[in-house]
């Protein structure tokens, strides 16, 4: 089974999602260059690190499917929260749903 993924490819809405999360006060690091199924962003928010896979909600559902590598990674991840988001509001909601403290 190939789990290499598509390193370097980013969804059109990624920069808008990053901007929205930073305006919220989150620390955001893009990991989209890594590939191997690793989600696109590391998001730090009030003591929690969230892995965030970005899909472009403007595209048809068939074009938003997880790659084999992404699905494998998310199914086997044993760390903190890992979510899939399609737009800025979903990203903000995911961050607000996962907070530990007021750091």
Q: Where in the sequence are the language-model features?
A:
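Catalytic phosphate/metal-binding cores of nucleic-acid and nucleotide-processing enzymes, i.e., regions
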Residues: 1-103
């Amino acid at each position: 089974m190939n789990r290499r993924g598509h390193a370097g490819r980013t969804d059109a809405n990624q920069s808008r999602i990053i901007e929205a999360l930073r305006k919220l006060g989150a620390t955001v690091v893009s990991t989209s260059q890594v590939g191997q199924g690793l989600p696109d962003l590391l998001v730090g928010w009030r003591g929690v690190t969230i892995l965030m896979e970005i899909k472009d909600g403007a595209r048809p559902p068939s074009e938003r499917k997880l790659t084999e590598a992404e699905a494998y990674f998310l199914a086997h991840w044993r760390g903190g929260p890992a979510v899939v988001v399609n737009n800025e509001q979903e990203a903000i909601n995911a961050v607000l749903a996962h907070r530990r403290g007021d750091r």
